Regions:
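PLP-dependent enzyme catalytic core of the Aspartate aminotransferase-like
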Residues: 2, 141-145, 150, 154-187
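Alpha-helical scaffolding segments of alpha/beta enzyme cores, especially the outer helices
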Residues: 2-6, 31, 105, 109, ...
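PLP-dependent aminotransferase class I/II
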Residues: 38-113, 118-121
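Conserved PLP-binding catalytic core of the aspartate aminotransferase-like
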Residues: 104, 108, 112-145, 158, ...
Length: 187
């Protein structure tokens, strides 16, 4: 937050912070809105609330900024079904908290483990970035297990979404098998 505050104060222009994964992270910059009049925070209902298909999010900023934006708002930019879904989800937002907490707990369980053949980024989202020089082997194991992951082969990493407890067990099985294969290959 200190860096964001410095940026806001150093530049006389809008500063937009994307907090798409805010529900999974311990920090938010919302507390800066009172002292940084040029700060705009965007959020989405796609990640923690499961409305990716609805393509809906929202903006948090000062009242003065909102009034200025309203004059430039495109009418009907969000369809009525997405709007209704957003209203329902936001009215029941607290009901999502246990699931969000489960995802955080299971994500942190992955991150707490140490492996010789790969590493995790320090994720504050609902996914893990896994890096290994043998990414092709790891991707093949995920594929054999029927798990779909996002590949960034050129950079030797992949992205795995924290799913249900069962899906996370399958991910763990793949990671354990990969670790075992890599350990055996080194001997």
């Amino acid at each position: 937050n200190e860096q964001i505050e410095k940026i806001c104060k150093a530049f006389d222009c809008p500063v937009v912070i994307d907090e798409a994964y805010a529900e999974f992270a311990p920090d938010t910059c919302l507390s800066l809105l009172d002292i940084c009049p040029n700060l705009y925070v965007t959020r989405t209902l796609s990640k923690a609330f499961g409305l990716a298909g609805a393509r809906i999010g929202f903006l948090i900023t000062s009242k003065a900024n909102m009034e200025a934006i309203r004059g430039n708002h495109v009418p009907y930019s969000v369809n009525s079904l997405s709007m209704k879904a957003a209203e329902i989800v936001l009215a029941h937002a607290t009901e999502f908290k246990p699931e969000i907490e489960r995802i955080i707990k299971e994500r942190d369980a992955f991150l707490s483990k140490s492996y010789a053949s790969f590493s995790f980024s320090n994720s504050k989202a609902n996914f893990l970035l896994i890096q290994t020089p043998h990414i092709d082997k790891l991707l093949a194991l995920f594929s054999q297990k029927g798990l779909s992951v996002r590949s960034y082969q050129q950079k030797n990493y992949c992205r795995v979404t924290i799913g249900t407890t069962q899906e996370n067990q399958w991910i763990q099985e793949v990671l354990d098998a990969f670790e075992q294969e890599e350990t055996n290959a080194m001997q």
